[in-house]
Curated annotation (Swiss-Prot):
The gene is psbA1. [CaMn4O5] cluster binds at D171, E190, H333, E334, D343, A345. The record marks Y162 as: Tyrosine radical intermediate. Pheophytin a binds at Y127. PROSITE patterns: REACTION_CENTER (PS00244). This is Photosystem II protein D1. It catalyses: 2 a plastoquinone + 4 hnu + 2 H2O = 2 a plastoquinol + O2. PSII is composed of 1 copy each of membrane proteins PsbA, PsbB, PsbC, PsbD, PsbE, PsbF, PsbH, PsbI, PsbJ, PsbK, PsbL, PsbM, PsbT, PsbX, PsbY, Psb30/Ycf12, peripheral proteins PsbO, CyanoQ (PsbQ), PsbU, PsbV and a large number of cofactors. It forms dimeric complexes. It is found in: Cellular thylakoid membrane. The record marks A345, A346 as: Cleavage. InterPro entries: D1/D2, Photo_II_D1/D2_sf, Photo_RC_L/M, Photo_RC_L/M_CS, PSII_D1. Its EC number is 1.10.3.9.
Length: 360
């Protein structure tokens, strides 16, 4: 009994030091308990992604024995290459390497894709938790991790929720540049995402956030308090940790209030920076919600053949032009996996060309 107790004591002797090191804010890079989960997951995802991008064999993404190559060694470049999503034959089944009969089978069915996205999603979730943890240790407010939840929600939407709704991980976003574009085209063709209000909010958040960031940066830079001569860099006029304001917010407020109108300009630095944070974050949240609803085929607005004249004849609109583009993309994607596109098979026949009204 004494021997067993001594062995346990020796094994646990370094545990307090390990705990102190993990939670110490004096480390050059904070680890944290979430970091203990984050680091191995992100390393595994990055390692598998790099190896698969370079050397993975073609993947039978559609489940029809027509493999699609995505790696460098099979003729792709940095633009066309991707980690190809797992096969439609696998569907939503969890497909770790031990579920396959051989490694060749695992590679052929796109096993690396699931390995990468699952470790990646766990890793970025742990990174978000680590942001909260470090804020807590330093006595800061927790809004940094709340802001980071916006891109995390987007990643979960395209890598997890959308495949769940569509019934297969083969519908997830490929891990590559051209693959991402293909995902976007197919998403538009099948769900009309450009006509979804939540996607519109996301566009407003991205472009609006960029605009507000540029406006704020240029206003601050233009109203710096002079601390240097003409021959010195203006950056030398600021010392890290100084108590004095480095720019004149009254001047910036006065300029912008006169450029637009008074109440378009913030007179409170705290409310200004809160707005700069919350606007793009909420808009990206809305976009993620839109992806999640369209995953279950609650799609964007449909204005096909919505305008008719007094005789009941259809007057083509831009809604019909957009519908033609969607149909064109839909008939061309996964060409050999379908006998006929679902949208064309389930609806009335659509004219191939928009006809001009007869004159006279």
């Amino acid at each position: 009994m004494t021997t067993i107790q001594q062995q346990r004591t020796s094994l646990l002797k370094g545990w307090p030091q390990f705990c102190e090191w993990v939670t110490s804010t004096n480390n050059r890079i904070y680890v944290g308990w979430f970091g203990v989960l984050m680091i191995p997951c992100l390393l595994a995802a990055a390692a598998c992604f790099i190896v698969a991008f370079i050397a993975a064999p073609p993947v039978d993404i559609d489940g029809i024995r027509e493999p699609v190559a995505g790696s460098f060694l099979y003729g792709n470049n940095i633009i066309s290459g991707a980690v190809v999503p797992s096969s439609n034959a696998i569907g939503l089944h969890f497909y770790p390497i031990w579920e396959a009969a051989t490694v060749d089978e695992w590679l052929y069915n796109g096993g690396p894709y699931q390995l990468v996205i699952f470790h990646f999603l766990i890793g970025i979730s742990a990174y978000m938790g680590r942001q909260w943890e470090l804020s807590y240790r330093l006595g800061m407010r927790p809004w940094i991790c709340v802001a980071y939840s916006a891109p995390v929600s987007a990643a979960f939407a395209v890598f997890l929720v959308y495949p769940f709704g569509q019934g297969s991980f083969s519908d997830g976003m490929p891990l590559g540049i051209s693959g991402t574009f293909n995902f976007m085209f197919v998403f538009q063709a099948e769900h009309n995402i450009l006509m979804h209000p939540f996607h519109m909010a996301g566009v407003a958040g991205m472009f609006g956030g960029s605009l507000f960031s540029a406006m704020h940066g240029s206003l601050v830079t233009s109203s710096l308090i002079r601390e240097t001569t003409e021959t010195e860099s203006q950056n030398y006029g600021y010392k890290f940790g100084q108590e004095e304001e480095t720019y004149n917010i009254v001047a910036a407020h006065g300029y912008f209030g006169r450029l637009i109108f008074q109440y378009a300009s913030f007179n409170n630095s705290r409310s200004l920076h809160f707005f700069l944070a919350v606007f793009p974050v909420v808009c990206v949240w809305l976009t993620s919600m839109g992806i999640c609803t369209m995953a279950f085929n609650l799609n964007g607005f449909n204005f096909n053949q919505s305008v008719v004249d007094a005789n009941g004849k259809i007057v083509p609109t831009w809604g019909d032009v957009l519908n033609r583009a969607n149909l064109g993309m839909e008939v061309m994607h996964e060409r050999n996996a379908h006998n006929f596109p679902l949208d064309l098979a389930a609806a009335e026949s659509t004219t191939v060309a928009l006809t001009a009204p007869a004159i006279g």
